[in-house]
């Protein structure tokens, strides 16, 4: 399995997570369609938020990154959102 973590802070991050929360059903539908989807978390922080996507392989997490980028461009272009810090890697242990 492969995990990608996107950390949003700075300009527009809080507003972005307000919109993501308002439209969480749409976000869920989009992410569940990712090839090899395993799990997803949308986490609010004091200065924005974090998303954690787990897929069967790197191809799935790459697809999720592209879909997230496209969704943000299409739905929150009016907010000046700083690009996320992206961390990714292969899972050593996954519990559910």
Write out the residue ranges for each language-model feature:
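Short S/T/G/P-rich N-terminal loop/turn motif that feeds into the first structured element of a domain
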Residues: 1-52, 56-70, 77-96
């Amino acid at each position: 399995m492969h995990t990608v973590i996107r950390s949003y802070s700075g300009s527009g991050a809080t507003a972005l997570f307000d919109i993501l929360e308002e439209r969480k059903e749409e976000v869920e539908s989009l992410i569940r369609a990712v090839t090899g989807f395993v799990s997803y978390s949308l986490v609010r922080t004091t200065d924005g938020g974090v998303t954690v996507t787990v897929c069967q392989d790197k191809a799935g997490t790459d697809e999720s990154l592209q879909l997230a980028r496209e969704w943000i461009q299409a739905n929150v272009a009016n907010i000046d959102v700083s690009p996320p810090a992206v961390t990714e890697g292969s899972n050593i242990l996954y519990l559910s």
